[in-house]
A protein has these predicted regions:
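Short, flexible loop/turn elements at secondary-structure junctions
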Residues: 145, 155-157, 220-225, 309-312, ...
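Nucleotide 5′-phosphate-binding alpha/beta core
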Residues: 1-140, 147-233, 241-278, 283-306, ...
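Generic preference for hydrophobic
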Residues: 334, 397-399, 454
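Conserved ATP-binding/catalytic segment of the ANL
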Residues: 418-475
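Short, structured coil segments at secondary-structure junctions
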Residues: 238-239, 330, 364, 393
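Conserved helix-loop-beta element of the AMP-binding
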Residues: 324-346
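Conserved AMP-binding/adenylate-forming
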Residues: 317, 340-442
Length: 475
């Protein structure tokens, strides 16, 4: 396992962090410099991946990519990899609980080296726990087929995954008025006068000062290494009080077993506990959270509510069904992300959900924000009041046509590709399963750089993530 990125990569990453902070504080940055740094990082990562990751080395060999200094355009043309790589293992390995085999697969797709001890796990949940103790963090997701994706992160990449977004999301949230103007000014001064790593350390130590006025209500699980669950768990650390809809970890064994069927009594017991929490006790969990939310409201405390669209929809419907007069304190906010499918599998109209949140909770429109991300990347794209997802400057985004050829232009639609300079332990040159429209123009909100206007799953790609899974469970 590579302990540290090489010097060229580290220099590029440090430069991109500074640009992220500048973009957060001023809404603009030197886009040409950012692209130069992204190219430097991509070239350095290309060499590391080719030397350390067998799967990527094979891709390079098949593409005839044998040089040591490819440009960004060459990498885009020859080295982009579908995100299906993270579920490319034989499904029989999990069916047979062959975790030695799963470890061998991980070592082919990532720059990691799981121990023999981790391969002796009894089940999938224990396997993830044992790997975590070795400094290997598997973040999982699942489509509606039940085929699990596992993204392997070493300690460096894990730190980037958890912390990089903190370089710009607090400031972008402040721009929408979520925190008081004096805190926004203080945050802006810190962004302009501190090195990024020092700013992250300060956020770790004193982040609760920003959100200490808020009680947090999280419409997800209190544990588990699934993408949106981790976002909620991290945000909860900064709130004065945190309440989770499901006070239990999200078990990958349960998620897979519900869709594909249990293979052992132990697995069935985990599935039964999961269904009890999410289906049988669903109303009780909603009532418990709403009762706590009502108390916060009566005490005059602001609230942050976080979750996926379908769960927020049901929370709002419960408020109306119980005829609660919830008018949360001014400054309360709702953040959401994840799949836009409801429990019956239909798409939830975004405008309808935003209006319902305002009606049932009294949240002002500019305090309702959405984020777009995915399990495989180190970063988050926040949607602005103009309904655009702004792409932070460390990401190189590529729009691909049906033949996976890059499309040029300032307003293009196609399959989204992302080159992530902070993916150190696995290939970060990824073709996603999302079909998007990307524009490059000054946004009316004042923020510069490229932005995504619309998002859908690419043709033939299954619904992915917690939203799609829960929709299937509850259908």
């Amino acid at each position: 396992m590579t302990a540290f990125p090489d010097q060229a990569l580290k220099q590029a990453q440090d430069g991109l962090k500074k640009i992220m902070v500048q973009w957060a504080a001023t809404k603009t940055c030197d886009q040409d410099k950012a692209r130069t740094l992204r190219e430097q990082a991509a070239s350095a990562n290309y060499l590391r991946y080719r030397r350390s990751i067998p799967y990527f080395a094979k891709v390079c060999s098949m593409a005839g990519m044998n040089g040591d200094s490819p440009g960004l355009d060459q990498i885009i043309e020859h080295c982009m990899i579908p995100d299906d790589i993270f579920k490319s293992y034989p499904q029989g390995l999990l069916d047979d609980r062959d975790f030695q085999g799963m470890n061998r697969w991980l070592a082919k797709v990532g720059d990691i080296g799981p121990s023999q001890a981790a391969g002796k796990a009894r089940n999938m949940d224990q396997w993830l726990d044992l790997l975590k103790k070795e400094g290997i963090h598997l973040v999982f997701s699942s489509g509606t087929s039940g085929n699990m994706s596992f993204v392997p992160r070493d300690e460096n990449t894990w730190r980037h995954f958890l912390k990089n977004s903190l370089l710009y999301t607090p400031m972008t949230a402040a721009d929408q008025g979520v925190i008081p103007s004096w805190k926004k000014l203080a945050l802006k001064l810190l962004c302009q006068n501190m090195e990024p790593d020092a700013l992250l350390s300060l956020t770790d130590r004193y982040g609760r000062l920003i959100f200490r006025d808020f009680d947090g209500y999280f419409c997800n699980f209190s544990g588990g290494a699934q993408g949106i669950q981790l976002v909620g768990q991290e945000l909860a650390k900064y709130c004065r009080n945190a309440f989770f809809l499901y006070d239990a970890p999200l078990s990958p064994m349960a998620v897979r077993g519900i869709i594909r069927g249990a293979t052992a009594p132990e697995e069935q017991a985990v599935i039964d506990a999961f269904l009890k929490t999410t289906v049988h006790d669903k109303k009780a969990n909603y009532h418990r959270m709403l009762n706590a939310l009502e108390k916060s409201s009566k005490r005059g405390r602001k609230a942050i509510i976080f979750g996926t669209p379908y769960l927020l929809l049901e929370i709002c419907q419960e408020v109306k069904a119980r005829k609660l007069n919830l008018r949360l304190k001014k400054g309360s906010a709702v953040f959401f992300g994840g799949g836009w499918k409801s429990f019956d599998g239909n798409r939830i109209p975004e405008e309808e959900l935003v209006e319902l949140i305002g009606e049932s909770l009294g949240i002002e429109r500019n305090f309702i924000a959405e984020g777009y991300s995915m399990t495989e990347i180190q970063g988050l794209m926040l949607r602005c009041p103009e309904w655009r997802y702004h792409i932070p400057p460390h990401f190189e985004t590529v729009i691909l046509d049906p033949e996976l050829r890059p499309l040029g232009g300032d307003d293009v639609t196609g399959t989204l590709g992302i080159i992530d300079p902070f993916a150190e332990s696995y290939p970060g040159f990824l073709i996603t399963g999302d079909h998007v429209r990307r524009v490059k123009e000054q946004c009316p909100c004042g923020r510069g750089g490229p932005a995504i206007i619309s998002i859908a799953r690419s043709p033939g790609r299954e619904v992915k993530g917690c939203g799609g899974i829960m929709a299937k469970i509850n259908a």
